[in-house]
């Protein structure tokens, strides 16, 4: 497919980057809010760990079917559907009155932002020139890192001025704004005939990946290295 004009490609990158920035901010924000949540809800270390893990549980639930959905429905439809869940999750977190409510809201947030990186990367393969792909992918990761940075001192300042509940209402509104921008800027996806696969075909594909000897060496690295890193960050 012919790459999109430069101006349109930049617009698409910016709206996707905005959504990914918010998603990583939401991911890491509980670490900054931990003292406040401990005081207000009488949480212990286990509860804080569950809040962080709840996000990743929701995130992980969608990853296997996500690739099939992206190929079949396209980045625009998939990310809009998921971000709608993130809006609900962030708003529900702001209204929480118990630990169970907080945890359920974090799971919804994890589900809701779980396509914020893979949907753009899928679209970039079709919409950007090949020589710009690596640059766009690396810039997306940089924007995600900035989102985690924004969850530290900036969030501490906002919480001291307005409180953590208004913060999550604002995050919910920002996700809704990202949805509007994506709806307006991102083109529709015309699936290629070969991209529509049945569930059984997708399952066989996952099986082939799992049986690959090289792949089976990778999960321990991800579990201990990346898992340890995000545990420290969240």
Identify the meaning behind each predicted range.
Residues 1-5, 189-219:
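Juxtamembrane intracellular "pre-TM" segments in multi-pass secondary transporters
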Residues 11-45, 232-234:
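Extracytoplasmic
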Residues 28, 56-64, 148-149:
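Residue-level signature of mid-helix packing/kink "hotspots" within the transmembrane helices
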Residues 30-31, 214-234:
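Extracytoplasmic gate region of multi-pass secondary transporters
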Residues 61-97:
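Conserved MFS/SLC helix-loop-helix module at the cytosolic interface between two early adjacent transmembrane helices
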Residues 89, 100-108:
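Paired small-residue
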Residues 105-143:
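Cytoplasmic helix-loop-helix junction between adjacent transmembrane helices
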Residues 139-187:
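Helix-loop-helix hairpin linking two adjacent transmembrane segments in secondary transporters
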């Amino acid at each position: 497919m012919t790459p999109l004009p430069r101006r349109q490609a930049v617009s698409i990158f910016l709206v996707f980057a905005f959504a990914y920035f918010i998603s990583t901010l939401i991911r890491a924000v509980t670490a900054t809010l931990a003292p406040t949540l401990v005081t207000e809800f009488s949480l212990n270390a286990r509860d804080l760990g569950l809040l962080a893990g709840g996000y990743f549980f929701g995130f992980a639930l969608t990853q296997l079917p996500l690739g099939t959905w992206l190929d079949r429905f396209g980045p625009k439809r998939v990310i809009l559907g998921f971000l709608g869940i993130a809006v609900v999750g962030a708003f529900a977190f702001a209204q929480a009155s118990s630990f169970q409510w907080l945890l359920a809201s974090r799971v919804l947030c994890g589900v809701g932002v779980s396509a914020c990186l893979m949907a753009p990367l899928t679209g970039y393969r079709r919409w950007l020139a090949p020589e710009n792909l690596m640059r766009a992918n690396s810039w997306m990761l940089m924007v995600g890192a900035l989102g985690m940075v924004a969850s530290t001192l900036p969030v501490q300042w906002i919480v001291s001025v307005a409180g953590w509940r208004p913060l999550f209402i604002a995050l919910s509104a920002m996700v809704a704004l990202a949805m509007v921008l994506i709806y307006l800027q991102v083109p529709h996806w015309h699936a290629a005939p070969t991209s529509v696969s049945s569930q059984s075909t997708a399952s066989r594909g996952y099986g082939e990946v799992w049986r690959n000897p090289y792949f089976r060496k990778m999960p321990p690295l991800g579990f201990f290295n990346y898992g340890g890193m995000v545990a420290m960050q969240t």
